[in-house]
């Protein structure tokens, strides 16, 4: 595996969305279907820095920073999932994206799947990893992080940890990567949230994870897009790592059997932020998969046969 780069070699782009500026990466040729990269919590487009260069030679790559995150504006919002839906919907329309291939992770997956369910004719493929799915009980949440996330979801304690102590950035983020993140990388992830007042999204997201039936509205929304995924023929590319967090090897095997038109790639050792452990494999396999969306052929992936 080559050395994992820490730089962010992309010019900034901004677009006004619902009265706020959203930052995004925009590189690659303008013809053809664009590839839309969606990050989750507590990251930004920086998460895709070593993956986009594999795809950009042949496809337009767009990677926004969700509202309140990265270099995007930080309006005074509650940062419920529905707030992110409104801003992402408006972002896609502001850029005039008629059709897209989605590359999604964490809460970016929930946003992407929810958008795809509502706009199926505009989605040409979905590459996903460590995506948001219903977690029936806390017993299915990784033991090493169970108490921490239960604390995050305890009102006063959670706000103290995430807002005041910045525990999601300083604690949860590095624990969910197999390799040690460098100080340069950590500083990139810290930069948008240096002020406690800007950390509201970091607190809201773990409180909306669909675990043990709560919160009910998010559980219903996630179940709805999971039902759609199990019915839709849209090409899917699922990356998984060992041991994983949201998607274990066993869960990946079940999804490979139950999701139609789904290819899978084993990235090797990985927890939640797979992009930080094996970005070159993820990027190269996405680049190899994209032509298959047009010609419908089978490809032998480095992670094994995928058809």
Curated annotation (Swiss-Prot):
GO molecular function: haloalkane dehalogenase activity
Pfam families xrefs: Abhydrolase_1 (PF00561)
One GO location term (cellular component): membrane
Claim: Hydrolase is one of the keywords in the record: yes
EC numbers for this chain: 3.8.1.5
GO biological process: response to toxic substance
SUPFAM superfamilies: alpha/beta-Hydrolases
Active site: 106, 130, 272
Gene3D superfamilies: alpha/beta hydrolase
AB hydrolase-1 domain: residues covered: 34-158
Keywords of this entry: Detoxification, Hydrolase
Keyword Metal-binding: no
InterPro entries registered for this protein in UniProt: AB_hydrolase_1, AB_hydrolase_fold, AB_hydrolase_sf, Epox_hydrolase-like, Haloalkane_dehalogenase_2
Induction section of the entry: Constitutively expressed.
Pathway membership, UniProt: Xenobiotic degradation; 1,2-dibromoethane degradation
Catalytic activity, reaction form: 1-haloalkane + H2O = a halide anion + a primary alcohol + H(+)
Quaternary structure and partners: Monomer.
PANTHER family: CIS-3-ALKYL-4-ALKYLOXETAN-2-ONE DECARBOXYLASE, MONOACYLGLYCEROL LIPASE
Family of this protein: Belongs to the haloalkane dehalogenase family. Type 2 subfamily.
Role played: Catalyzes hydrolytic cleavage of carbon-halogen bonds in halogenated aliphatic compounds, leading to the formation of the corresponding primary alcohols, halide ions and protons. Has a broad substrate specificity, which includes mono- and di-chlorinated and brominated alkanes. The highest activity was found with 1,2-dibromoethane, whereas low activity was measured with the analog 1,2-dichloroethane.
Name this polypeptide is given: Haloalkane dehalogenase
Organism of provenance: Mycobacterium sp. (strain GP1)
